[in-house]
Amino acid sequence: MMDLDRIIDQLHIYEKKVLKAFEGSDKPLKPEEIAESQKIDIKSVMSASGALESRGFVRVMKDADEVVSLTEDGESCAREGLPERRLIEALKGEEELEMSELSRRAGLDKKEAGIGIGWLMRKGWGRISQGMVSAVSDETPERGADERLLELLLERGSVRIRELPDELRGALKDLKGRKGIVDIRKIKRHTIELTTEGRKLLERGIEIVEEATQVTHEHLKSGAWRKLHYRGYNIDAEYPLVYPGKMHPLRRIIDEIRSIFLKLGFTESRGPIVESAFWNFDCLFQPQDHAAREMQDTFYVKNPAVTDLPCEDLVRAVQDAHETGGSTGSEGWQYEWDRDVARQSVLRTHTTCVSARFLSENEPPLKMFSVGRVFRRETITYKHLPEFHQVEGIVAGDEVNFRNLLGILREFYRKLGFEVRFRPAYFPYTYLSTECEIYLPEKKSWIELGGAGMFRPEVLEPLGVETPVAAFGLGIERLAMIRFDIKDIRMLYQSDLGWLRGLPVTGDLEL
């Protein structure tokens, strides 16, 4: 039930005046009538009526009218007569006249005379033969509907078309065809009607009291503010929904991850998306017959199909590691390593190749991370995409060990807001290796969210690195699915404005 007194107190003074205008009236009112009775301007009436309509107290009905008026030429025709009328008047007492002489007597120029002759014949008032014009009858033709309409418009200035009788509407059609005589424009009409709810407010009693729009220093100093009337605030009023520009949620998480690693003292690095198999696979001690290299798992680039290998010393060291284990003490993979296979161009399948490049170019101690897109020939499903983002990182130094790695990962996941645990795992290029699992309290379950380990000697020695190196990797889309409670990974790349607008602007992200 409405609190009528509270609502009335919250109304603007102009809204009250619009309602007061309906006292003693059950009919809709024009804005002009309200403005005149309440001594306010039309603009204020319309503004207040719009506010009242939004709350259901009045209805603003809109209608459009077409209004016809005379142009400057039309006024001339109304005063002096249409060209055909002036021609027929000039023919009075004459059996016939040559066209130029008739035009001169009628006071018409060549163009006006041509128009007049056409209408003279169309109305059946005259005829033309061998350049001579004559009247059909000795009697002066009666004024037509078009002439009566011109006279009416000259007298009244403008007329609503819907108010014209049918005869004059037909004449208006003819005058519209004679360009430049009449002007037709649309005007909007508004009427305002009081609703049942508005009538309840009016019957409750509305008092018009001037409101204070601001409290000045003088009001405060003199105490006059205590006697001023203030309009109440409507804290229940509906507010407009605002859809500001927002950063995409995936970009927000990437920025959050970047921020965490930068605060932990890491350096950011990037690498090419089109990579050689050498950096993507061989450098990481992945054999050339490994299943991950198959066409069904990796995108091979057609152009350029091959890339240059790095310096010969590095290539030879990687070859030795694969074939015999080199100087690492390992037996390697015991096969004949092929340079042509290593030169093949691929879309990188992980960002670990960035770590390999970084280690080959920089001396430990170091801490590096990289965020970028990776590509795998995955069938698109609710949890797999052929293109996604990955964050990769390494820590290298004499004192770096597996326990340091676990500590860094624990701190990283803590900053993301997750409890983490570690389970033993296997990866081709790390040993010891672990999988990171985070706990989801709402599901009371653990979910795998990344892998990590210590780079094997077969990876490090060819790169010339003599210190231990800890490495880790994480799929960012999977993290986004958990963070935003998404069941289908494809949602991250669909233009679902409803979902995007519903996400919080800030809050759980450390930006």
Curated annotation (Swiss-Prot):
One of its GO terms (cellular component) is cytoplasm. It catalyses: tRNA(Phe) + L-phenylalanine + ATP = L-phenylalanyl-tRNA(Phe) + AMP + diphosphate + H(+). One of its GO terms (molecular function) is phenylalanine-tRNA ligase activity. L-phenylalanine binds at residues 352, 390-392, 429, 455. It is an enzyme of class 6 (ligase). InterPro entries: aa-tRNA-synth_II (IPR006195), aa-tRNA-synth_II/BPL/LPL (IPR045864), Phe-tRNA-synth_IIc_asu (IPR004529), Phe_tRNA_ligase_alpha_bac/arc (IPR022917), Phenylalanyl-tRNA_Synthase (IPR002319), WH-like_DNA-bd_sf (IPR036388), WH_DNA-bd_sf (IPR036390). Keywords: Aminoacyl-tRNA synthetase, ATP-binding, Cytoplasm, Ligase, Magnesium, Metal-binding, Nucleotide-binding, Protein biosynthesis. Binds 2 magnesium ions per tetramer. Its EC number is 6.1.1.20. One of its GO terms (biological process) is phenylalanyl-tRNA aminoacylation. The keyword ATP-binding applies. It holds the Pfam family tRNA-synt_2d. It is found in: Cytoplasm. Its cofactor is Mg(2+). Belongs to the class-II aminoacyl-tRNA synthetase family. Phe-tRNA synthetase alpha subunit type 2 subfamily. Tetramer of two alpha and two beta subunits. This is Phenylalanine--tRNA ligase alpha subunit. The gene is pheS.
